[in-house]
UniProtKB/Swiss-Prot annotation:
Chain positions recorded as [4Fe-4S] cluster binding sites: 122, 125, 213
Motif PP-loop motif location, chain numbering: 47-52
Assembly, per entry: Homodimer.
Organism: Salmonella paratyphi B (strain ATCC BAA-1250 / SPB7)
The protein's name: tRNA-cytidine(32) 2-sulfurtransferase
Pathway(s) per entry: tRNA modification
Localisation per UniProt entry: Cytoplasm
The organism's place on the tree of life at top rank: Bacteria
Amino acid sequence: MQEIQKNTKKEQYNLNKLQKRLRRNVGEAIADFNMIEEGDRIMVCLSGGKDSYTMLEILRNLQQSAPINFSLVAVNLDQKQPGFPEHILPAYLEQLGVEYKIVEENTYGIVKEKIPEGKTTCSLCSRLRRGILYRTATELGATKIALGHHRDDILQTLFLNMFYGGKMKGMPPKLMSDDGKHIVIRPLAYCREKDIIRFAEAKAFPIIPCNLCGSQPNLQRQVIADMLRDWDKRYPGRIETMFSAMQNVVPSHLCDTNLFDFKGITHGSEVVDGGDLAFDREEIPLQPAGWQPEEDDTSVEALRLDVIEVK
């Protein structure tokens, strides 16, 4: 009995510590990008996955002690995939006492009609979903739309664009929506996926599977995800360093003429960003930039979230 109590206390301690880290990460992102302002009504897009559950939980937690007032409304889009457990999210949100809205739109039928069998449906599905969410935000009077993308998603997108798109473009933590009417925010921008996995497992969120549509997986993104996961295991701190690089861009040392006026450099021009250091031996710090090892940075390969079996 004492051993059980000891384990329970340790688990609670670890959960509290993890929640504080996620709360700190989200708080810093909100402050750095001015994501949430006084009086905001935040529409939290809830898919039923680990990321959106974590985002809602941390925002609710911050709401209690934030120096500003803001409200939350959770929104789920029921796209009418066969077998979608439509009772799960309403029951969960009612138990929490969170305001919510379930939007029912048969985008599944549209996608199946337009996309050949076996082809990736994500692009069309995403466009349809985006338009519905923008419309819903207007109907609810939401001032911000919160999405659950985390740090790993942002890095994956950067490498996807570099490897396959020929662009150095990531996923912005805050942006104006396509229709020019809504501000979209990503409060989990500084959060590590492995922390979210641990948190979701500890909180036992009722995870809904994301493979109900039967679409082919995004193989390119999976390749990038596997690469980053391998780097994280073999070279601790590399992921943090790469993310720091996204926040420390030097346009004069890249090749984009839209970002820097290379033609304007003439005799007598001032030295910019250290000038030409190409022939100097670069001093590389012994510890990766932006990395602080955590006590509980153990492998999460064995962690698996319990997914509700859909019958």
